[in-house]
Amino acid sequence: MRRLPPAAGSSRQSLLPLSNPGLTMKKEDVLKQYTTPTGAPAFVPGPHRFTSREYLNITYRTDREALAKLVPEPLEIDEPLVRFEVMNMPDTTGYGSYVECGQAAVVRHKEEVGEYIIGMYLDNLPAIAAGRELSAFPKKLGSARLFVDSDTLVGTLDYGSLRVAAATMGYKHKPLDFEKARAEICVPTFMLKILPGYEKRPRICELVRTEISNITIKGAWRGPARLQLFEHVLAPLADLPVREIVAATHILTDLTLSPAVVIYDYLTDSAPQSSSKEK
């Protein structure tokens, strides 16, 4: 009977301690790694190009007191406005295809108006890991969809088996000026970067800023919309209730995300001297 060779990693020799220290990964090679596992990284480094990235955006008015609990200083709130978004990303270098949903508050940092990202939900591990590690996107696991149902653009978000958001918009009712669409997508974005240390205190606690600059608008529309948010303790979008729909847009783009820069360090209670805005 023919004998099969031992499976990879199953030989007795592989279980013995290494006799030659030179066979281990050198320290300088460890420093070349950008994430783990080192043999099969959770994501590939950028830049990541998003082709045919499609947005359903609904801006709505909410309760100021509820929003103030979620927006960190030194950011300020002029009006209690929130943008609910569902993004279909069918062709992304390194990440593949996925759909994402989130909420962003309209805020101001000094004289600059932008958005503070409250939370993002998606079901693509590389995009979750890279968003949290390489940048500061507050991503967690969820299942979003963006699709056309007859004459309606529909966006949904499920957390586990439960529906937590449902958005509908009239499909391509009125054209939206491309420059207005560009301004909406390229608004400065602020996020919290928090990395805990081993002794419970944070090792990193920063407010960062990013801004999309490399973008092509391929289509843009506006129209009527409705948004329903459902209570969930671990996906608390409904903590910012919908009081009034302000605007709704449907935008198709190609774009590349810019790296984030630190604008405030909570551990030193200061803005880094070397910080500069990414343009």
Question: Which ranges hold each PLM region?
Answer:
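Short, structured protein-protein interaction patches enriched in aromatics and acidic/basic residues
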Residues: 77-108
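Acidic, Ala/Val/Gly-enriched low-complexity intrinsically disordered segments
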Residues: 7-8
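Phosphate/adenylate-binding glycine loop and adjacent helical scaffold
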Residues: 129
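Basic polycationic patches enriched in arginine
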Residues: 2-3, 12
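N-terminal ordered "arm"
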Residues: 41-86
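Interaction-surface and assembly-scaffold signal
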Residues: 27-39, 133-279
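Short, Lys/Arg-enriched N-terminal segments with co-localized hydrophobic residues
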Residues: 12-24
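Active-site-adjacent structural patch at catalytic or cofactor/ligand-binding sites
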Residues: 99-112, 116-126
